[in-house]
Amino acid sequence: MTRCKHDVPEAPAPSADPDAWWEPISAEAPAGPWLEYDTAYAALGARMVPPVEVQYGDFRQRRDAPAWPELERECRDLLRRSRDITLLVWWLRCRVHACGADGLEQGLRVMQRVLRALGAHVHP
């Protein structure tokens, strides 16, 4: 995987490396389980929402911007368990925030390889 100047060094866990994501998780379930109702998946999805300003009368509050390196680690953790197009898009967004155009290129390349290798097995 291409690293960029904003990447935080970490020891990759098994299958946390995007270069392994196009390999089946198991013979019985190549894409692993669908995590749609998994609490970690739902929490990650809620944190991927861009910050918005909320105003009620004189009260104003702006939610903090997402912590992209932390969100990327969470995407990788979930992608170890499941091949899900939504997770891949979230991971791609994290890579764009970390590396700009290089992150976009890397993310699209990984998504293409996953979809070619696992096709219809990838969860929506």
Question: Positions of the model-derived regions?
Answer:
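N-terminal domain-start signal
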Residues: 1-124
